[in-house]
Structure formats: structure tokens, C-alpha cells
Design a protein with these regions (language model features):
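Polytopic transmembrane helical bundles with strong interfacial aromatic enrichment
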Residues: 1-136
Length: 136
């Protein structure tokens, strides 16, 4: 029988948390147009509830990411790996920054661009994470 290690659990938590962060945005992209045509108050309630789930997930992804980096000696890894890791971290940071712009923005532009960039950079960070895991 295969026995899970702390690395198994760390990676599992990281992927689940990132999936909630990014996957939830994809689901919302499909729901928001329908909700928007009905009760405007409902849209606000859905957004607040999503934030209650997505921000803790982002925190878990961040903490497990830090834990993962602490477990490796980055200096011993190839330059390519280090560059991809840096770009992944940068994309994750941009995703969070765009989410803040989306959340705090009052204009349609801030909401639209912030939401779109949150998803785009989140997807990029997930892809780069998979690239790091499967080999550069």
C-alpha cells in the first residue's frame, strides 16, 4: 500500500486551495450574468460568500507554497526552475492584487478588469505550478 507523506498532504492541500481560488472564479463567471439579470442584492451576497471561501483558500495556497519552498534548496535547482518558480509566485501575487482591485473597485472597468486578471493570473500560476511539479 502507498503511504502518504507530509509532501503528499502539502501538495494535496495546495492544489485543492488553488482549485477553490481559480475554479470558483470560473464558476462565478458562468453564474454572475444570470444573477445580474435578477436581484442585484443577490449578486452582492454571492460575491461576499465567495470571498469568505476564496480568500481562506488563497491563504492556504500561500502557506503551503511557502512550506514547499522551505522544503527545497532553491539554490541547488536549475536556473530554469528558479525562473519558473519566480514567475509563478509573481502571477499568484498579481492574481491576489487583481482580486483586491476587483473587490474594492467601484467602476465596471475595475470590476471587469480586476476579475479577468484575477482569473488569468491564477490560471497562469496553476499551470506554472504543474510545470514545476512535472519537470522543467
Amino acid at each position: 500500500m502507498l503511504n502518504p507523506t507530509s509532501e503528499t498532504w502539502r501538495l494535496f492541500l495546495h492544489v485543492v486551495a488553488a482549485s477553490v481560488w481559480v475554479g470558483g472564479q470560473i464558476v462565478l463567471a458562468g453564474i454572475v450574468p444570470v444573477v445580474r439579470t435578477g436581484n442585484r442584492e443577490l449578486l452582492s451576497l454571492v460575491a461576499r460568500q465567495f470571498a469568505r471561501l476564496s480568500w481562506p483558500a488563497f491563504l492556504v495556497a500561500t502557506l503551503t507554497g511557502i512550506w514547499s519552498i522551505a522544503e527545497i534548496n532553491v539554490g541547488d535547482l536549475s536556473t530554469e526552475y528558479q525562473v519558473v518558480l519566480f514567475v509563478k509566485l509573481f502571477c499568484a501575487g498579481l492574481s491576489a492584487t487583481a482580486a483586491v482591485v476587483h473587490s474594492l473597485g467601484n467602476s465596471k472597468v475595475a470590476k471587469g478588469v480586476g476579475g479577468s486578471m484575477t482569473l488569468l493570473f491564477g490560471l497562469a500560476a496553476m499551470f506554472l505550478g504543474e510545470l514545476l511539479q512535472t519537470g522543467v
